[in-house]
Amino acid sequence: MASHAGSRIARISKVLVANRGEIAVRVIRAARDAGLPSVAVYAEPDAESPHVRLADEAFALGGQTSAESYLDFAKILDAAAKSGANAIHPGYGFLAENADFAQAVIDAGLIWIGPSPQSIRDLGDKVTARHIAARAQAPLVPGTPDPVKGADEVVAFAEEYGLPIAIKAAHGGGGKGMKVARTIDEIPELYESAVREATAAFGRGECYVERYLDKPRHVEAQVIADQHGNVVVAGTRDCSLQRRYQKLVEEAPAPFLTDFQRKEIHDSAKRICKEAHYHGAGTVEYLVGQDGLISFLEVNTRLQVEHPVTEETAGIDLVLQQFRIANGEKLDITEDPTPRGHAIEFRINGEDAGRNFLPAPGPVTKFHPPSGPGVRVDSGVETGSVIGGQFDSMLAKLIVHGADRAEALARARRALNEFGVEGLATVIPFHRAVVSDPAFIGDANGFSVHTRWIETEWNNTIEPFTDGEPLDEDARPRQKVVVEIDGRRVEVSLPADLALSNGGGCDPVGVIRRKPKPRKRGAHTGAAASGDAVTAPMQGTVVKFAVEEGQEVVAGDLVVVLEAMKMENPVTAHKDGTITGLAVEAGAAITQGTVLAEIK
């Protein structure tokens, strides 16, 4: 599809959603609202997910990981061809900000529901985006004009501009591949970790450096732009409540901004998008310092996780707007809308807030979302779903809306108390605590939360989760069965106890029934705080060992880096001593409680 208004633009007739979870459900429902048939795709672990069932058609991508499924260009384009879909919506994450995939979709003769590949390329490269922002006269803190070539350049920048500094993935976002250095000595390790995370998440490891604003707010502008040069800011959001630089709570409009700050954000966001020749839905992100200084952060060239709070306060369906823009239509709004009330979104992630938000994969044995006035739940799971470690940790999003911020907070307290999830740890206990925390509630002078507030100031009294069941991949063996539907050969995967039998109650050929592993309720093992063993605090993959056999360490030294749900997690020494008995190797998949090494 051409990216300019002067050419003839095809119209969407059938949408393939190249994603999973709650965003796939969200886009499928929008397609139904628009009268468009939808197509889902899925990896093997998602075969029974709600988005697969809700779509008009679903095609298996195969594979257990993102790389084998949702990141595979050929498989997704093949599913589009087989289904007859003429448009692809990427959701967010995965291939949503991949310019090469956007171009491949267009080259295949399909409609790409998103910005042009060139805009994605320019704004997705954080260094190029800074150049665009500078030309648009957006506010900016000092940073390297191009990616750095090594840790030495990072050290040189820190020595010139001072600490703290942020090392950031040049081709990513969402907190992945971002590390903050507060001392010169930690720069080499943090740079190496940022490069690893960036490579794993985005396929490219280049990083740039900029001065880090201490205790900033994260404020952003939701932009929608058509292919005729019209740009509107649908509203602002505050996303300051984060852990590991990934958002947990978002609200709209951004509270406690001056009229000048709000105007500067709206105006500069529009200038940046026009400078980049942007069309589609996008988000221009800023940091706001304690002194009120505003600094451009990045542009996310896709729909954001937190888009529902803007929908609730602006009265705009942003996914439907994406469809209309992709169809070549002009925006049906010409001015920035005035916010209607206040909305807050809470991400319901599979993480244990009582253990520093460690990823906590597991089965969802009960999912009971709240309802009532001013309550919306966007979910990608249901009772019986299994949250594995292959993908990110989000189960659902709770969105509350009120006449003002106070009413939204009151509804949030009620809805969070109603929200029931069993079987695995979630961040709901954190949300219940934060909506009553004076730092977040604020007063006439504003609130005191910032992007590092959770890690540095929040008093975490939440008990570690103990009521779940361990994830047992073998509990329900599956069998693939070939069936014909209207003459079309379809391969389906069924639980073995539901698969076809010979009519006498015997197991189907090739099905091996496994006795379920005994489950211990309440079992909970974290990283050792005493004794010699250094144990894995979570299920995940060993990325690297930072120590060698016989090496002397002191308490707090990095021992091993684990990866789970697309985030790296350091495991440190709990006491002084000598490393012995390195028990696993880099690349090994481990479970919570696995002994990684001992300190004698």
From Swiss-Prot:
The keyword Lipid metabolism applies. Mg(2+) 2 binds at E298, N300. Mn(2+) 2 binds at E298, N300. It is an enzyme of class 6 (ligase). Residues 130-327 form the ATP-grasp domain. Keywords: ATP-binding, Biotin, Fatty acid biosynthesis, Fatty acid metabolism, Ligase, Lipid biosynthesis, Lipid metabolism, Magnesium, Manganese, Metal-binding, Nucleotide-binding. Residues 524-600 form the Biotinyl-binding domain. One of its GO terms (molecular function) is biotin carboxylase activity. GO terms for biological process: carbon fixation; fatty acid biosynthetic process. The keyword NADP does not apply. It comes from the Bacteria. Carboxylase activity of the AccA3/AccD5 complex is stimulated by interaction with the epsilon subunit AccE5. Activity of the AccA3/AccD6 complex is inhibited by interaction with AccE5 and by dimethyl itaconate, C75, haloxyfop, cerulenin, and 1,2-cyclohexanedione. Binds 2 magnesium or manganese ions per subunit. InterPro entries: ATP-grasp, ATP_grasp_subdomain_1, BC-like_N, Biotin_BS, Biotin_carboxylase_complex, Biotin_carboxylation_dom, Biotin_COase_C, Biotin_lipoyl. Mg(2+) 1 binds at E285, E298. ATP binds at residues 158-219. Its cofactor is Mg(2+); Mn(2+); biotin. Its EC number is 6.3.4.14. Component of a biotin-dependent acyl-CoA carboxylase complex. This subunit catalyzes the ATP-dependent carboxylation of the biotin carried by the biotin carboxyl carrier (BCC) domain, resulting in the formation of carboxyl biotin. When associated with the beta5 subunit AccD5, is involved in the carboxylation of acetyl-CoA and propionyl-CoA, with a preference for propionyl-CoA. When associated with the beta6 subunit AccD6, is involved in the carboxylation of acetyl-CoA and propionyl-CoA, with a preference for acetyl-CoA. Homodimer. The biotin-dependent acyl-CoA carboxylase complex is composed of AccA3, which contains the biotin carboxylase (BC) and biotin carboxyl carrier protein (BCCP) domains, and an AccD protein, which contains the carboxyl transferase (CT) domain. Can interact with AccD4, AccD5 and AccD6. The AccA3/AccD5 complex forms a dodecamer, and can associate with the epsilon subunit AccE5 (Rv3280), which stimulates carboxylation by the complex. The AccA3/AccD6 complex forms a dodecamer. Interaction of AccA3/AccD6 with the epsilon subunit AccE5 (Rv3280) decreases carboxylation by the complex. This is Biotin-dependent acyl-coenzyme A carboxylase alpha3 subunit. It comes from Mycobacterium tuberculosis (strain ATCC 25618 / H37Rv).
